[in-house]
């Protein structure tokens, strides 16, 4: 009977995922055929978080200057509105993940993120470009301070709730998740593979920072999948190569960009090491059944002969382990109150 129920549940979840994929495909077609004609009227992250350079004619009393100032003001206001909506959704997700019934809304969060932040907004705003603008400002570039809010605000939110942004709100992570089809690619699920992918992420972050220091410009936007995958008019062929590689690998690997490249996920993961940060861990109820390990697609949970351990740097707070554990052996803690397992 239990086996039958598991099969029914698996078929049900599979049908839900197919429904979401159909919805996303419809929006993809709509984005190409209809929204593509109006994309110029929508502020994309390439414009909103671009490097801001003051015009040499700044201060002139011409009508054109006044119009440009008004346009810039509207763009900034529009960008801040969307950033605040994203931050609110992230806080909401941080609360929802604590409750079993509300965790079921995660798929709705992800689909909404892809539709609004992806197909409607063209990948705007982009957290990576917000992160880059911090460095550009420190390097003396003239940057709109409003573009810094996105990344900086994610730091305290992650401290309070963990990486819920990655697991519930990020539109690129959501897209990879819905593309993912199979977990049979076992070679990339080992502890050694996880360590190698983390090292690759560190090198990617260092490369990004070095590029910013040497060039004082945002060259990464030419290959940034956060925006490129949702902006079909982008001319950068190298970027499209990486996007194609990401889409193909997402079929076999769970969130490959998140696991190997994304600097935002890496930095937000480091927040879990700060004393007082919200973390997940196993408690005394753990019977080493390995269910949570099997449920964890991001491979944040490791298992030995004694009990399971959770690596909060990798955990995206999807809640699958919390829902799957029948012994309530996984709980929320604070870094200062309990050592992470």
PLM features: residue spans?
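Non-ligating segments of multi-cofactor redox enzymes
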Residues: 3, 8-20, 32-304, 313, ...
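Bacterial N-terminal signal peptides
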Residues: 23-31
């Amino acid at each position: 009977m239990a086996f039958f129920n598991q099969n029914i549940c698996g078929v049900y979840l599979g049908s839900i995922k197919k429904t979401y994929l159909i919805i996303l495909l419809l929006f993809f077609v709509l984005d190409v055929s209809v929204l593509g004609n109006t994309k110029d009227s929508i502020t994309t992250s390439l414009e909103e978080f671009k490097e801001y350079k003051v015009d040499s004619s700044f201060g002139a009393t011409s009508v054109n200057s006044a119009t440009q100032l008004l346009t810039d003001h509207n763009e900034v206001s529009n960008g801040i509105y969307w950033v605040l909506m994203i931050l609110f959704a992230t806080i909401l997700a941080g609360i929802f993940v604590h409750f079993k019934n509300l965790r079921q809304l995660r798929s709705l969060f992800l689909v909404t993120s892809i539709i609004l932040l992806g197909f409607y907004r063209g990948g705007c705003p982009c957290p990576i470009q917000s992160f880059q603008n911090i460095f550009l400002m420190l390097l003396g570039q003239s940057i709109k301070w409003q573009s810094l809010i996105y990344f900086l605000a994610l730091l305290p939110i992650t401290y309070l709730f963990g990486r819920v942004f990655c697991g519930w709100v990020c539109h690129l992570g959501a897209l990879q998740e819905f593309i993912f089809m199979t977990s049979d690619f076992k070679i990339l699920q080992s502890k050694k593979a996880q360590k190698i992918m983390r090292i690759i992420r560190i090198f990617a972050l260092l490369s990004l920072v070095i590029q910013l220091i040497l060039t004082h410009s945002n060259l990464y936007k030419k290959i940034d999948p956060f925006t490129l995958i949702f902006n079909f008019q982008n001319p950068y062929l190298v970027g499209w190569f990486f996007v194609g590689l990401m889409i193909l690998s997402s079929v076999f690997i769970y969130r490959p960009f998140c696991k190997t490249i994304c600097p935002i996920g890496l930095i937000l993961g480091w927040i879990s090491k700060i004393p007082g940060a919200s973390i997940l861990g196993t408690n005394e109820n753990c019977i080493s059944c390995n269910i949570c390990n099997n449920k964890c697609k991001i491979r944040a949970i490791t298992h030995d002969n004694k009990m399971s351990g959770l690596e909060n740097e990798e955990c995206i707070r999807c809640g699958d382990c919390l829902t799957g554990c029948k012994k309530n052996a996984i709980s929320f803690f604070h870094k200062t109150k309990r050592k992470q397992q």
